[in-house]
Amino acid sequence: MTIRLLGRTEIRRLAKDIDFRPRKSFGQNFVHDANTVRRIVSASGVHRHDHVLKVGPGLGSLTLALLDRGAHVTAVEIDPLLAQQLPTTIADHSHSEINRLTVLNQDILTLMPSDLENQPTALVANLPYNVAVPALLHLLAEFPTIRSVMVMVQAEVAERLAADPGGKDYGVPSAKVRFYGNVRRYGMVSPTVFWPIPRVYSGLVRIDRYETSPWPTDADFRAQVFDLIDIAFAQRRKTSRNAFAEWAGSGNESARRLLAASIDPSRRGETLAIADFVRLLQRSGEAEEQVRVQ
């Protein structure tokens, strides 16, 4: 039996059958266009050997398409009604693929590796505006087995995630996601392919985790790097010397550490790439050690 994807009429009929009304607080807008669904799944690079963590499966459009690729899917849905309905929908529109689906009714921000029987190798997510960045950073940190990410978010969030250093959209999210891997845009998604129709465009972003990380990835090191990123963007128009003065203990010490990391102290924090923040932390530790030895 070939998997049948959900169209607009089917999605609305299914919602009516289970007496479901989309909730804005959960960012519930469901893709009903088959071409868009196939485009997203194709761009994700998911194949039959993957175990996919699907965040926000909703009524099941993307989940069906992921199963159609032969992947195993763990779908995490915060809405209890949708989580309860999803296995039935998958069974009705496929055949043996239901055996490759696991559904959890849980808040993604609380999900931990111990909650899953199989650790995911890929993440496909449709994230609402208010939790997009925290959820993405949480999953990247807690699930190092995830090698690739395809996320659909509001267009402005997509622009921030994929922005380059020095650009107007470059900020804390841009720098932090690059701690984990390479980031690139995969185009826009029109509001008209959703039900209900949102007021804004969505954007697709793919993240590929570094094959071998250029820097340590332990939680303590990551937290220190992220602290530097937060400091730099708290007053993004300040020079790096002034921005890091309190952290370093003085303006002069800030300049010394920046120079040790081959960073011009007059540069603004908004121009620093993730490698700059990492180098600043590492060279600062080396500089402090040299001072103690002297």
From Swiss-Prot:
Compartments (UniProt record): Cytoplasm
Catalytic activity: adenosine(1518)/adenosine(1519) in 16S rRNA + 4 S-adenosyl-L-methionine = N(6)-dimethyladenosine(1518)/N(6)-dimethyladenosine(1519) in 16S rRNA + 4 S-adenosyl-L-homocysteine + 4 H(+)
Protein keywords: Cytoplasm, Methyltransferase, RNA-binding, rRNA processing, S-adenosyl-L-methionine, Transferase
Similarity comment text for this entry: Belongs to the class I-like SAM-binding methyltransferase superfamily. rRNA adenine N(6)-methyltransferase family. RsmA subfamily.
One example GO MF annotation: RNA binding
InterPro entries, sorted: KsgA/Erm, rRNA_Ade_diMease-like_C, rRNA_Ade_methylase_Trfase_N, rRNA_adenine_dimethylase, SAM-dependent_MTases_sf
Name this polypeptide is given: Ribosomal RNA small subunit methyltransferase A
NCBIfam families for the chain: ksgA
PANTHER family for the chain: DIMETHYLADENOSINE TRANSFERASE, DIMETHYLADENOSINE TRANSFERASE-RELATED
Binding site for S-adenosyl-L-methionine: 29, 31, 56, 77, 107, 126
Species classification: Bacteria, Bacillati, Actinomycetota, Actinomycetes, Mycobacteriales
Primary location: cytoplasm
EC number: 2.1.1.182
Role summary: Specifically dimethylates two adjacent adenosines (A1518 and A1519) in the loop of a conserved hairpin near the 3'-end of 16S rRNA in the 30S particle. May play a critical role in biogenesis of 30S subunits.
Gene Ontology CC annotations of this record: cytosol
